[in-house]
Amino acid sequence: MSLAENLTAVQQAITAACRRAGRDPKSVTLLAVSKGMPPELVREAAALGQTLFGENKVQEAKAKIPLCPGRLRWQMIGHLQSNKCRDAVHLFEMIQSVDTPGLAEEINRWAEKQAKTMPVLLEVNLAGESTKFGFSPDRLLAELGALNALPKIEVHGLMTIAPWAPEPEKVRPLFRKLRELKLQCEDKLGASLPHLSMGMSGDFTVAIEEGATIVRIGTALFGPRPKAARPPASEGGG
């Protein structure tokens, strides 16, 4: 199918999942995962009305973003190294993959230098997979107050990467667990966290049924990435 057909199919699946869950389809944002994809495809998606894109690597984003329409919005969804924080804070409207207190502090430092406040999501490793990054639920709750106190960071919610499963229903308990963890975080902070970023091409409808507000879709939109561009399982969208 063409990109236009794929985009329509994904949007229809989002709407159907929202209806099953009794949710407004406008409460779910489609983030198009453009990692490994050329600027031409991003421009084609933009011409079809897609405006939010996600990248996994700062260097790739740094080269790609200037070649794309300026009205597009970009978020960082892959593992971020501390030495890339300066560029990440400059390039992205949100960093979804904050996985350690040290990284949060470095983002805060560069946001202060660049005179901006950086929205972030805290990445949670719910399945305890050694191949993936993220806070354990217990550590997240223990560190949450200190993370939220950083003056140039705004914690907007949580993100997770579910293990691959042939049947999406198998990861439903993890998505439900992230939603419940967000409620615990809100109780601890005494404030609402607007976002749950969870669900990729193979399981996003289940994620929506469990409360996702952002779904990260790559393959279902753009087709399989070239082999050289395929990221490891620890990366944040597909």
Where are these predicted regions, by residue range?
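Gly/Pro- and small hydrophobic-enriched strand-loop and loop-to-helix capping segments
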Residues: 212-230, 235
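Conserved alpha/beta-domain cores
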Residues: 1-202, 208-210, 222-224
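Eukaryotic N-terminal low-complexity, Ser/Thr- and Lys/Arg-rich leader segments
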Residues: 1, 235-238
